[in-house]
Structures are given as C-alpha cells and as structure tokens.
Curated annotation (Swiss-Prot):
Residues 35-44 have a biased composition (Low complexity). It is found in: Nucleus. It comes from Homo sapiens (Human). This is Zinc finger protein 581. Keywords: DNA-binding, Metal-binding, Nucleus, Repeat, Transcription, Transcription regulation, Zinc, Zinc-finger. May be involved in transcriptional regulation.
Amino acid sequence: MLVLPSPCPQPLAFSSVETMEGPPRRTCRSPEPGPSSSIGSPQASSPPRPNHYLLIDTQGVPYTVLVDEESQREPGASGAPGQKKCYSCPVCSRVFEYMSYLQRHSITHSEVKPFECDICGKAFKRASHLARHHSIHLAGGGRPHGCPLCPRRFRDAGELAQHSRVHSGERPFQCPHCPRRFMEQNTLQKHTRWKHP
C-alpha cells in the first residue's frame, strides 16, 4: 500500500507505511464489484490497475491511499476464481468486505464533526446522527413514546421497549457460558468479555 501526498506531510496516526498495513489481509468468498472488478467486463484479462481511496486519519485530516488490488491478495489466492480482498482499518484493524465500508468507518477515528445543529450548535460526525438529534428540539422534547408505568419518555419505540424490561423483569439475553441472563445485549457482551475471555 502506498500513501500519496496529503494536506499534512504524513497522517499523524501512522509513523510509516508498514504500520498502516496492519495485520495480514485476508481473502473473502465473492468478487467485489467496483473499479478493479473484471465481472462483466470485456477486458477480463487486462492487468489490474491501482485504485485511489480517500480515508481520514485520527486527527480528521483526509489522505489518499493507492491500492494495487492484485498485490494485496494473499499468496496463492490470486488465481482463485470468485475470491476478493477484504480491507483492514489501519487504525483499529477491523476488517471490511468493501473499501466503501472502510471509508465510512474511517470517520469514527476522526475528531472532525462537520454536521452542526443550527438550533443548539452541537456537532456530529454523521448526518444521520444530526437528524436524530433534531428530534429533541421538537415539541415535547422530541420524546413522543411515554412509558405507561412511569413518567419516563423516549425518542423511539425501541428505546421504550428496552426500558419496559425494567418493569417486566424480562432478561432475553442468555450468556452461552453460564446461566446468567441480561436485559440488554451490550451488558451481555461486557459480561462475556470480563467473565469468559
């Protein structure tokens, strides 16, 4: 992988190209449609071209990555039909099936919050998060779903359903390693990490 010039001399999150590459890449099952795909192309035998991708480093500075798709494949996998590359985040090593997913994920490592609420000034990394935030400025505080058993109100029906377990005592999330049950899936995940590593 080759890093091309960016607004700063080198992305601050990485000290070298080797540290950007992260763990070894793996090969997935199906071909990825996109700029380097030869599916449905009359030039299926032409050599692959390097592709440019825009990512964002941990300081929010965009930088371009040049990826030669063929050289990034695992040894022995280049001739295997129906296999494609998966992309690994250079910051956290999380693996993605498509480069577009990696690009979307890269904003999570940035401190830049370009979407600002015009009412209160709170800023967000994603437009969808700003849209959800706008509901708090609606009449009633943007919490139309009220609990019938207590005065609490919620933005959406899913939050109300999750809260209702407090009153019902329902614990739908069973630990696969022990008899404990949990009201929320994230609590089960925390339990599993701590008690059953």
